[in-house]
A protein has these predicted regions:
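Short active-site oxyanion
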Residues: 61-63, 150-155, 245-247, 284-287, ...
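A donor-sugar binding/catalytic signature common to diverse glycosyltransferases
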Residues: 98-120, 124-127, 276-318
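Membrane-proximal basic amphipathic "stem/tether" segments
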Residues: 1-40
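C-terminal amphipathic helix plus adjacent low-complexity
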Residues: 1-4, 24, 337-384
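Donor nucleotide-activated moiety binding/catalytic core segment of transferases
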Residues: 81-97, 253-297
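Catalytic binding pocket for nucleotide-activated donors in carbohydrate/polymer assembly enzymes
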Residues: 178, 264, 294-363
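Active-site and donor-binding regions of nucleotide-sugar-utilizing enzymes
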Residues: 33-192
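Conserved catalytic-core segment of nucleotide-activated headgroup transferases in glycan assembly
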Residues: 43-55, 179-261, 367, 371-373
Length: 384
């Protein structure tokens, strides 16, 4: 970056911080929501389903979505505002309710009559988190997470185990609403037309089955942890089921900054990283391959098979730490391509479902498909 650019952003940051302090004295708009998904991502995740429930009810609220890219498409009446623009500071300062999916600092000096809600971007994860992760997280992230917890009025939880974790490791001792995640409501209320629409948007034939690969992020550029042999996998699935299959790859959002893993893309191996809604991709998929991501629990709500491709499990355990219960999940661990193919060949639907039901009880699953309704009910009482 050129010196001129560095100076520009330093000055701009100073101006933003000045605006944060000045806008603190502006009145709060009792009908305004500000929603933010993953620090400026497109229309998706739980805020999308909260917004759609508000719109469905015809509630007279001003819905503002903070984005990094103004070309993102949003339904009316949602207003897009550039996250890095001074206008976003104004929207945050004057909003009654602020909803985020990521823990971290934003350009806000919170007022007593504002309500700050955290809806996690995933269910409970296998990796060590927050205070539990210790020195594996950088100081900037830890400070941002502590700030986020200090201003939060409500955390949303999807399981009893997640609630326990939040209150133990997240530097948070406030209220936790145990209702499930709005983004997972879709798994309880979809129709065949929903599946058909999404497949059309993705570019997948209606009569083809889908295996979705959604790995978590690593702080390294090696392609080795993600090296699934797609040809062998698709052949094994076709032999197991007698159906035609397509492999979809969905990269973690952080891969944008580090470069995502490479596959030999074709009409049977498709990159869907830019598709805005991960839950819709899960909905149309018949098999999920993941690793240490909480996506496995989202997908399991539909009782469809999950396989864990954990080629680097020992290295990842040393780098980030993995919780003890992770090694008890009912999903097959596959440390290489041979084990992945064998797991597909040996899959037994009845035994798998029984194991999943038992694990649901262990971690206290709270998903019922009504999270959006419950949260908007709560927000209506706050907006009065």
């Amino acid at each position: 970056m050129r010196i001129k650019d560095i100076l520009y952003w330093r000055v701009y940051y100073k101006i933003l911080q000045l605006c944060v302090r000045l806008f603190y004295y502006l009145p709060v708009n009792k009908h305004k929501f500000v929603l933010m998904h993953d620090f400026g991502n497109a229309y998706g995740d739980s805020p999308k389903f909260i917004a759609e429930e508000i719109i469905r009810r015809g509630l007279p609220y001003d819905l503002v979505w903070l984005v990094n890219n103004m070309s993102y498409s949003f339904p009316k009446p949602i207003r897009k505002v550039k996250l890095s623009h001074i206008k976003s500071v104004y929207e945050l300062a004057t909003a009654k309710v602020i909803i985020t999916t990521m823990k971290g600092r934003c350009n806000l000096k919170k007022k007593k009559n504002q309500f700050f809600m955290y809806v996690p971007h995933g269910q409970i994860g296998a990796k060590f988190v927050e205070r539990q992760a210790g020195t594996t997280l950088n100081t900037e992230y830890i400070n941002g997470s502590k700030w986020h917890s200090s201003v939060s009025d409500l955390f949303i939880s999807s399981s009893k185990l997640f609630t326990e974790e939040m209150l133990t490791w997240y530097w948070y001792d406030g209220e936790v609403m145990e209702c499930g995640l709005p983004r997972n409501d879709i798994f309880f209320h979809y129709t065949p037309n929903d599946v058909k629409r999404i497949k059309t948007e993705v570019g997948v034939p209606e009569n083809v089955k889908i295996v979705l690969y959604g790995p978590t992020f690593r702080n390294e550029k090696s392609n080795d942890p993600y090296a699934i042999d797609t040809d062998r996998l698709l052949t094994a699935l076709e032999q197991k089921t007698g159906d035609k299959w397509i492999f979809l790859f969905r990269a973690h959002p952080n891969f944008v900054w580090y470069g995502k893993p490479a596959f030999d893309y074709s009409d049977k191996v498709i990159d869907v990283t830019n598709y805005p809604d991960m839950q819709e991709l899960l909905l149309i998929s018949d098999v999920l391959i993941s690793d240490y991501s909480s996506t496995m629990f989202d997908f399991n709500l539909m009782h469809r098979p999950v396989f864990l491709f954990t080629k680097d499990i020992e290295a990842y355990q040393k780098m980030r730490g993995l919780k003890d219960w992770y090694f008890k999940v009912p999903f097959p661990f596959c440390h290489n391509n041979d084990e992945l193919i064998q797991a597909v060949q040996n899959y037994d639907e009845q035994k798998y479902h029984e194991a999943c039901k038992s694990f649901d009880k262990f971690y206290g699953n709270l998903e019922t498909g009504t999270a959006s309704q419950q949260i908007v009910n709560r927000l209506e009482t706050i907006m009065r």
